[in-house]
């Protein structure tokens, strides 16, 4: 469903005229803002299948800091692996990395087996440190949940289920105007929560192993 479709879906539900573009009026622009607020809330509520992707980086000998190009500092890593040497990378904390690189007279070199996040670059992409310091070219793969940028063009499409986004935007619009002549704001939020929980339940069925907790 497109950005414009969702905005018009919200407008209809609060008894407003549809628009031919999200930027038609100040009010439709505000509804667009509510749609993006709702989108962010829904995307952050669950590790949606539609948001899962793989980011790769290729190492160089002697370099241990790399940008995850395209991450835009808006990812959750599910797992990471050294695809060249065929094993999973293990996350280590900043103190561990500082000890290996700063407290040691000579940092070990070899095939990378550990990673840590270390800021963002000038493009806004997440920076990753790896250890040992690569001694050759290795391909590292990061399986991530990649949250999407705000919708902006009328034709932009939503990746996550649209009903929770639409109904949460309706709730936000109803709260802003104070009344809708029918359903209360609290009821709108309850409806949105119901759509969200149903959508999560359906998507979670694709990843049942992620709902098993071990003590």
Annotated model-derived regions:
Residues 1-215:
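Glycine-enriched, solvent-exposed interface loops adjoining structured elements
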């Amino acid at each position: 469903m497109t950005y414009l479709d969702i905005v018009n879906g919200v407008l209809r539900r609060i008894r407003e005229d549809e628009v031919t573009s999200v930027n038609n009026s100040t009010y439709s622009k505000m509804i667009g803002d509510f749609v993006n607020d709702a989108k962010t809330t829904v995307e952050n509520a669950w590790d949606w299948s539609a948001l899962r992707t793989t980011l790769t980086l290729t190492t160089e000998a002697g370099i241990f800091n790399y940008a995850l190009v395209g991450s835009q500092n808006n990812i959750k890593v599910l797992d990471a692996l050294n695809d060249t040497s065929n094993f999973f990378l293990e996350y280590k904390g900043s103190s561990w990395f500082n000890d290996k690189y700063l407290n040691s007279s000579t940092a070990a070199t070899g095939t990378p087996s550990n990673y840590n996040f270390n800021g963002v670059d000038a493009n806004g992409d997440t920076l990753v440190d790896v250890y040992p310091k690569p001694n050759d070219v290795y391909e590292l793969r990061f399986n991530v949940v990649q949250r999407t940028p705000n919708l902006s063009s009328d034709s932009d499409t939503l990746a996550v289920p649209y009903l929770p986004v639409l109904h949460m935007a309706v709730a936000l619009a109803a709260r802003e105007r104070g009344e809708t002549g029918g359903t209360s704001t609290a009821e709108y939020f309850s409806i949105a929560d119901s759509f969200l929980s149903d959508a999560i339940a359906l998507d979670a069925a694709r990843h049942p192993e992620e709902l098993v907790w071990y003590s």
